C-alpha cells in the first residue's frame, strides 16, 4: 500500500495482491419468507471461484478515493471552517465581532442555508437513486455509470476553487456541495452493486470491510495533509481570499481522480443480460411493485431496509454532531477537534477491516447488532460521565467511532448477499432511498433533546435513541447465518 501512496512500483503493488480470494463452500439457500435468502449460488457472483486480489483492491480504493469529500469538504474543514465562517457574511456585521447577536445570527443563517441545500440534495437522491439503479442494472453498465458520477464529483469538488471569500460566492459553494452530495450517493449505488463482482459469499464481509476501512484511512491521510499544510503556514503561499481552503478542494479533486482510476482499469464491467430501459414514471411504478413484492415474498428484506434506514441515520448523526459535542460540550479547540477526527477515522478504519472477518464467520446481522449495542452504551456513558471531563469523550467517543464502520460495512455486505442477481444496483438504490427517507430522524432528535433539556450534551441521547430504535427493528430481521455460523474461508 505504501508503495502506491509514495509513488513506488505500482506493478509490484498489484502483483503482490494478485493472490485470489477463494470460494470454499456455499451457504444453504432458505425459502422461508421470514428469513432473508442466501445468494451463495446466485449468478450475480463471479463465475469463477477465484477473484484476483488486484480487482478487490482496485474496487476498495474507490472508497479511499472519495472519502476526502466527506471528511475534508463536508465534515471537518471546508464547510465547518470556511463556508460557514464570517468570510461569507456582510463585512459590516463581521466587524461587530463574535459577541454581537447580529454576528451570531448571520453565522447561524449560513449554517442553516447550508443545511437546507444538503436537505434538498437528499430529497433528490431519494427520488432518483432507485430509478437510476434500475437503469444501471438494465443497461448492464454499472461501471460506466460509476465513472460518469465520479467525474462529476471531481468537477464539483474542483469547482470549489472558485468559491472566493465573499458573500456573493456562498451559494455557489452550497450548490457545488449539494450537487456533489447527489452524485456521490448515486455513485455509491453502483459502487455497492459492483461488490458482487469482486467477492464471493465467503469473502463478501472482508471485501466490504476493506473498502470501508480504506475509506477511513483515506480520510486520515487527507486530514493529516491539511494539518501539515497549516502547521507549515502553506510554505509561504498567499492564502488570502480563502485560497488555502480553495486549494484544499482542488487537492481533494485530484486525490479522487487519481485513486479512483484503478477500479476503472482493473475491475471489468459486469456481465449480465441487458433488459429494456423504462421511463422514469414506469420506473417508479416498478419501485412500488417491488416494495409490494418484498412485503409479500421477502418481508424480512423489507424489515432490513427499514431498520437500516433508521440506524444508518443515527450512525451518520454520530459523525455529523460528534465535532459539535467535542467543541461545545467538552471544550475542544479547533486543533483538538481535527486531531480527534484523525484519531476517530484511524480507529474506525482499523476496526472495520478487522470486523469484516467476523462478518464472514458469524454473519453480518450479528456484527450489526453488537456494533449498535456498543454505540448505544458508549453514548449513554458520554452523557452520564460528562462532568468528568474530556477524557470521557476521548475514550467513549473513539469506542463509538470504532463501531460505526463495522455496522455500515456489515449493512452493505448483508444487502449485497440478499439482493436478487442482476438487480443489485436497483436494491442499493432502494437502500439509498430508504436511508434518505429517514435522514431527518437524527437531526430532529438532536435538536429536540437540546430544546427539552437545555444543553448540547443532551443531544447525544437524541442521536443514540435513533440508533437504539434501529437496533430494535433489526431484531425482526432473520438471515441464514442466524441458524449457524459460517466456517471461515
Could you describe each region identified by the protein language model?
Residues 39-56, 268-306:
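Juxtamembrane intracellular "pre-TM" segments in multi-pass secondary transporters
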Residues 209-230, 434-442:
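Glycine-rich segments within core transmembrane alpha-helices of 12-TM secondary carriers
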Residues 144-159, 366-381:
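Structural signature of the two symmetry-related core transmembrane helices
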Residues 255-266, 461-489:
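Multi-pass alpha-helical transporter architecture, strongest
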Residues 107, 230-253, 448-467:
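A membrane-interface helix-boundary motif in multi-pass transporters
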Residues 186-199, 406-419:
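Intracellular juxtamembrane helix-capping segments at the cytosolic ends
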Residues 127-141, 351-364:
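Helix-to-loop junctions at the C-terminal end of transmembrane segments
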Residues 73-109, 320-336:
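Short amphipathic helix-loop junctions that connect adjacent transmembrane helices
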Amino acid at each position: 500500500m505504501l508503495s502506491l501512496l509514495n509513488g513506488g512500483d505500482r506493478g509490484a503493488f498489484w502483483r503482490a495482491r494478485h493472490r485470489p480470494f477463494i470460494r470454499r463452500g456455499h451457504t444453504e439457500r432458505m425459502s422461508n419468507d421470514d428469513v432473508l435468502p442466501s445468494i451463495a449460488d446466485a449468478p450475480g457472483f463471479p463465475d469463477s471461484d477465484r477473484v484476483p486480489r488486484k480487482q478487490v483492491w482496485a474496487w476498495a480504493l474507490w472508497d479511499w478515493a472519495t472519502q476526502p469529500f466527506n471528511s475534508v469538504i463536508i465534515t471537518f474543514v471546508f464547510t465547518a471552517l470556511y463556508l460557514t465562517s464570517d468570510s461569507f457574511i456582510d463585512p459590516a456585521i463581521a466587524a461587530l465581532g463574535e459577541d454581537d447577536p447580529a454576528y451570531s445570527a448571520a453565522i447561524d443563517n449560513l449554517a442553516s442555508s447550508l443545511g437546507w441545500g444538503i436537505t434538498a440534495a437528499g430529497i433528490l437522491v431519494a427520488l432518483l437513486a432507485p430509478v437510476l439503479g434500475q437503469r444501471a442494472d438494465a443497461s448492464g453498465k454499472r461501471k460506466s455509470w460509476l465513472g460518469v458520477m465520479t467525474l462529476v464529483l471531481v468537477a464539483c469538488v474542483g469547482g470549489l476553487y472558485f468559491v472566493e471569500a465573499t458573500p456573493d460566492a456562498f451559494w455557489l459553494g452550497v450548490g457545488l456541495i449539494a450537487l456533489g452530495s447527489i452524485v456521490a450517493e448515486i455513485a455509491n449505488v453502483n459502487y455497492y452493486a459492483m461488490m458482487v463482482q469482486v467477492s464471493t459469499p465467503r469473502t463478501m464481509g472482508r471485501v466490504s470491510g476493506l473498502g470501508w476501512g480504506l475509506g477511513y484511512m483515506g480520510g486520515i491521510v487527507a486530514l493529516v495533509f491539511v494539518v501539515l499544510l497549516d502547521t507549515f503556514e502553506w510554505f509561504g503561499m498567499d492564502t488570502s481570499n480563502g485560497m488555502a481552503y480553495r486549494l484544499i478542494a482542488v487537492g481533494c479533486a485530484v486525490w479522487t481522480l487519481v485513486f479512483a482510476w484503478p477500479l476503472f482499469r482493473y475491475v471489468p464491467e459486469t456481465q449480465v443480460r441487458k433488459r429494456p430501459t423504462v421511463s422514469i414514471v414506469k420506473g417508479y411504478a416498478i419501485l412500488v411493485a417491488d416494495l409490494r413484492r418484498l412485503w409479500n415474498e421477502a418481508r424480512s428484506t423489507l424489515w432490513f431496509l427499514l431498520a437500516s434506514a433508521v440506524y444508518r441515520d443515527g450512525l451518520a448523526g454520530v459523525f455529523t454532531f460528534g465535532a459539535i459535542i467535542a467543541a461545545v460540550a467538552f471544550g475542544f479547540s479547533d486543533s483538538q477537534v481535527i486531531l480527534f477526527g484523525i484519531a476517530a477515522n484511524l480507529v474506525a478504519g482499523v476496526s472495520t477491516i478487522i470486523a469484516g472477518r467476523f462478518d464472514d464467520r458469524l454473519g453480518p446481522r450479528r456484527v450489526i447488532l453488537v456494533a449498535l449495542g456498543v454505540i448505544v452504551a458508549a453514548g449513554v456513558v458520554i452523557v452520564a460521565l460528562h462532568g468528568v471531563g474530556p477524557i470521557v469523550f476521548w475514550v467513549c467517543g473513539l469506542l463509538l467511532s470504532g463501531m460505526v464502520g463495522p455496522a455500515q460495512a456489515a449493512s452493505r455486505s448483508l444487502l449485497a448477499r440478499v439482493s436478487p442477481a442482476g438487480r443489485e444496483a436497483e436494491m442499493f438504490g432502494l437502500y439509498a432511498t430508504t436511508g434518505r427517507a429517514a435522514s431527518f430522524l437524527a437531526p430532529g432528535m438532536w435538536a429536540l433533546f437540546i430544546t427539552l433539556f437545555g444543553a448540547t450534551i443532551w443531544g447525544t441521547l437524541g442521536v443514540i435513541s435513533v440508533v437504539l430504535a434501529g437496533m430494535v427493528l433489526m431484531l425482526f430481521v432473520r438471515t441464514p447465518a442466524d441458524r449457524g455460523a459460517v466456517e471461515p474461508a
